[in-house]
Structure formats: structure tokens, C-alpha cells
Curated annotation (Swiss-Prot):
It comes from the Bacteria. SUPFAM superfamilies: Photosystem I reaction center subunit X, PsaK (SSF81563). It holds the Pfam family PSI_PSAK. The gene is psaK2. It is a multi-pass membrane protein. It is found in: Cellular thylakoid membrane. The keyword Membrane applies. This is Photosystem I reaction center subunit PsaK 2.
Amino acid sequence: MFNTALLLAQASPTTAGWSLSVGIIMCLCNVFAFVIGYFAIQKTGKGKDLALPQLASKKTFGLPELLATMSFGHILGAGMVLGLASSGIL
């Protein structure tokens, strides 16, 4: 019997290997997600604060907000890399 996960892994196309362009896409997606999250998250400052200087506004951007935006950025980046690799651009 074949494992279903093994069959799905074999059916998926090969993805792009690590390169400078993949790293740049991931960094840009994370910065984009950070900017979106900074303005979209309404209730900030509920968790631990970061040991970094805050932006000029009175909004505190803590560790939970950073983890949320970076997780979203990695999801966006993985989707961008997979989409660009499958279309042949990357």
C-alpha cells in the first residue's frame, strides 16, 4: 500500500531551490506583512514589548504582533515563491 502523503509529494512539481532571488522575495514579503500588520492590528501592546525603539506613533508593537506579522509574511513568501517557480519566472 502506498502512503497518501507519498503520492501527493510525488505528484507535486519540483520547487525552486534556495537562491538570492528566493531570499529577496521572502524578505520583501516579510517587510510587506510587517507594514500591513503595523497598521491593521488594532489592539497592540498586550504581550511582551520588543527591546527595539518604537516608531513615532504611540502604538506599541510587541512580540505577539511581530510573530503574527512574520508568520503571515512567511506564508505570503512561500506562496509567491511557489507561484513564481511553477510559472517559470523564478
